[in-house]
């Protein structure tokens, strides 16, 4: 079984498969993952509870538009801990996130009811992270066999269970995940408030104009390319065959060059972030 075409990106040209070896989600911790970062934020916030939870959050230190680099570090550190870390790393990060999440809940005037401890919302965020990692991995390393896809998926549950998602909540098979994903995507909705917030993000309104002007067109292109039609339509981004071809050719070239990069370059950043988390824990410093 596969997801509905509107709910996943469609790639007609991709690099040849590197190998038939066993795989895990850790193999997806590649430096090129940053290219899909903004798209994944859009995916997550397209669930109304997550969208308003972020837009209305009073946790100023985690505000993406006010502290973009700090927020990026927190998200990337979470991925490093969830995928590469051990049980102690995950417990420490869970405590830090729980402290911040206690302040994130809807108020009387909120148009959507939400609570950051809602396991269904956390499952959605974890699912978006998984889909983003799977998309980037297959663009860089080629399409997985059915067996590899199942291995990859089964190793990814810690994306959710590092926080409040229960093991039994994570769909047991890749086919079950596709069913979950299609049902969840049917609930995608974005109003003007969340849409404007996300457009400000992609327009890089929060960074220095000297960086914004040259990088904004590339970010918009990459973000739209990594969005499935259901999300692209929700946020109002245009796309066409020409852009799709350019996106595919770009990642064919990136994938070719990526083959020659040693693992410590492709994945070293994630291990440095994990080491930083451990250093902060040892020094009793804040993680987020």
Language-model segment annotations:
Residues 1-288:
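Mature, function-bearing regions of proteins
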């Amino acid at each position: 079984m596969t997801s509905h075409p509107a709910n996943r990106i469609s790639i007609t040209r991709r690099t040849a498969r590197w190998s038939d070896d066993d795989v895990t989600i850790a193999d997806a911790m590649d430096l090129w993952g940053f290219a899909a970062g903004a798209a994944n934020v859009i995916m997550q916030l397209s669930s109304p509870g997550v969208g308003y939870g972020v837009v209305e959050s009073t946790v100023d230190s985690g505000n993406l538009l006010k502290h973009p680099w700090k927020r990026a570090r927190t998200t990337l550190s979470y991925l490093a801990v969830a995928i590469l870390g051990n049980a102690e790393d995950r417990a420490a990060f869970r405590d830090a996130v729980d402290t911040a999440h206690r302040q994130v809940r809807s108020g009387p005037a909120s148009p959507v009811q939400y609570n950051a401890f809602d396991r269904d919302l956390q499952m959605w965020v974890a699912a978006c992270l998984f889909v983003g990692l799977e998309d980037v991995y297959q663009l860089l390393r080629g399409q997985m066999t059915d067996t590899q896809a199942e291995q990859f998926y089964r190793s990814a549950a810690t994306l959710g269970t590092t926080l409040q998602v229960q093991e039994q909540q994570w769909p047991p098979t890749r086919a079950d995940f596709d069913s979950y994903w299609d049902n969840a995507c049917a609930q995608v909705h974005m109003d003007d408030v969340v849409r404007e917030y996300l457009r400000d993000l992609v327009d890089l309104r929060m960074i220095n104009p000297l960086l914004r002007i040259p990088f904004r067109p590339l970010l918009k292109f990459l973000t739209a390319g990594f969005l499935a039609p259901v999300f692209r339509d929700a946020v109002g981004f245009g796309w066409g065959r020409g852009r799709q071809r350019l996106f595919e050719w770009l990642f064919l070239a990136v994938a070719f060059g990526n083959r020659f990069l040693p693992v410590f370059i492709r994945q070293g950043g994630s291990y440095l972030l994990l080491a930083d988390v451990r250093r902060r824990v040892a020094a009793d410093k804040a993680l987020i």
